[in-house]
Amino acid sequence: MKKLPRTVIVLGFVSLLNDLASEMIVPLIPILLATVIGAGPVALGLIEGVAEALASLLKLWSGRRSDALGGRRKIFAVSGYLLSNLARPLLAFAGSWGTVLLLRAFDRVGKGIRSAPRDALVADATSPEIKGYAYGFHRALDNGGAVAGSLVAAAVLAWSGLPMSQVILLSVIPGLLAVALLALGVKESAPKSAIKRLPPLRIADVPPRLRRYLAVLAIFAFARASETFIVLRGFELGAQTVELLLLWSALNLAKAATSTAGGRLADRIGRAHVLLIAWTLFALSFLFFGKIDSSAGLWAVTVFYGLCFGLGEGAERAAISEYGDAAAQGTAFGWYHLVVGLAAIPAGLLFGSLWQWQSPAMAFFVAAGLAALAALLLRVWAWPSKTGGAPQGDTVLRP
């Protein structure tokens, strides 16, 4: 197994610091909405859905723009991380769910600007045979930062006596450290000549194999509603704030535990095989979520869900990196983020509405069904072709 490039390692630690900052805040949002602002599951679904969809529109633009500039991607990554880490701490002053929505939107705009160019930086620096490993490593450190963030928030709340608002403000410290590490530690490849005029952006011009994969991903994204609903479920079951932060930490630790191994496995046996396993287990975990009625059960299922989720993270992104031309990696990742993110609004509203007007169990059961459908379509409609000399682990799909 080849060594990971320095760029991939540094970007991994940038994500670790950024997620440390982010996850000091994100698991507190459903608690903030429920206890301070008095908003319900539909508001939570709308906030998370709108924020993710807005980010996704920008991900396609930023990825495509970084391609047009000859692979100049770092400026987009730095700008995006900076915006997010200036906007997030202001949630400490939010007094209405509309303000929470606005600030989450600014946070996600930053994510939208940085994500596709950052993923393309990883692709630019990595040889094809270790792409799954590279993305799995990156996701593992990202999830490791999420573990650390929620643990830091729990420790501060438990032992310092500071209110939630001050914990949120403290997140600016690791966030700005992430920006500094990226600005000083990543050196991108020498840029190619800028493209004076990009071809029109049309979904019809996307290769059929990629369109099929994106369609399946969109269905899976409908199942993958915001994980803050797991926190809300714990709150409804009577868990206290510190316990919920520890639960969030356990979720992300479970993701980190399988992310790198899942990426390596995808490089060996094929990305589609790993995705099929991960998505099937994901559907099973949501069936379990619908049946639990105790805090202990929630802990067990949350850890199981995290292990399943982490298993497929590296494979999902490594697959995308194989589809576009080397000069259009940013655009390929932009399409990926756009499709997944645009599903976030209807997914969040559907999940929140089922939760509020039917039951939490119904919301989880519907999500499980959608995940199972995505796994089935991956196998029967968008499965990799072994023709055409694709390398082992390649996920080129049949036209």
Predicted regions and their residues:
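Intracellular juxtamembrane helix-capping segments at the cytosolic ends
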Residues: 113-126, 311-324
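Juxtamembrane intracellular "pre-TM" segments in multi-pass secondary transporters
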Residues: 1-5, 188-217
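C-terminal membrane-cytosol helix-exit motif in multi-pass small-molecule transporters
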Residues: 172-194, 374-382
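Central cavity-lining transmembrane alpha-helices of secondary-active solute carriers
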Residues: 46-64, 249-261
